[in-house]
Amino acid sequence: MNIITTTTTDTTTALLRLMAWLSPVFPVGSFSYSHGLERAVHDGYVADTATMSDWLRWLVTRGSGWNDAVLCAESWRRAVAKGDLVEVAELAEALAGSRERHMETMLQGEAFLAAARSWPSSVFDRLPADCPYPVAVGAVAGANKVSLGLTLAAFLQAFCINLLQASIRLSVMGQNGVTATMSDLEPVLAETATRIEKTSLSDLGSATYISDIMAMKHETQHSRLFRT
């Protein structure tokens, strides 16, 4: 009997690499960052499953999650086309709106590149030593021939999963709430990833001011679980 499958060996390998790079156990220290969520919980903006779902939805479609994914896509394209990755890295760093957001993206980017060198590629020579996280992910994925669509969908999901893990530690919700939220956000993530495939740097923009302010206020928060 012949078994027909639509997954090729190359696609499977690419998917395995992507899952490894964006896994919570990949050594980038993502567990120590809440992206301002800790302050949002402290100030009452996020208090339960519904408000957490809304918070993520806005970040992914109108906020920092959107911008990071646009930067990831641009880096992917430049890695494939042998374009200027330093330029997009400098832009991504400049877009970090506060000290802790800057720390979060730069330290994770540095750690990602160090760990991803287990998959040798010439793209590392084209990236700056100080590289924002979404630029690092996009460039490495592009250089390893992982499809842009898969890269963006996985990147957005990893962004949400990290904050959902933080929400458990902050006692916003339990594991059932997390799985319900991921199911609820699935079409949003898929649609947003598809939209971002067609974007350029001119599509960068954010309207999630409260999230940005929470990231700034967290800098002076005395009692904390997270670095950001």
UniProtKB/Swiss-Prot annotation:
Gene3D superfamilies: Urease accessory protein UreF
UniProt keyword annotations, A-Z: Chaperone, Cytoplasm, Nickel insertion
Transmembrane segments: none
Predominant localisation class: cytoplasm
A GO MF term: nickel cation binding
Compartments (UniProt record): Cytoplasm
Assigned GO CC terms: cytoplasm
Stored InterPro entries: UreF, UreF_sf
Quaternary data: UreD, UreF and UreG form a complex that acts as a GTP-hydrolysis-dependent molecular chaperone, activating the urease apoprotein by helping to assemble the nickel containing metallocenter of UreC. The UreE protein probably delivers the nickel.
Similarity field: Belongs to the UreF family.
Known function: Required for maturation of urease via the functional incorporation of the urease nickel metallocenter.
Name of the featured protein: Urease accessory protein UreF 1
UniProt lineage: Bacteria, Pseudomonadati, Pseudomonadota, Alphaproteobacteria, Hyphomicrobiales
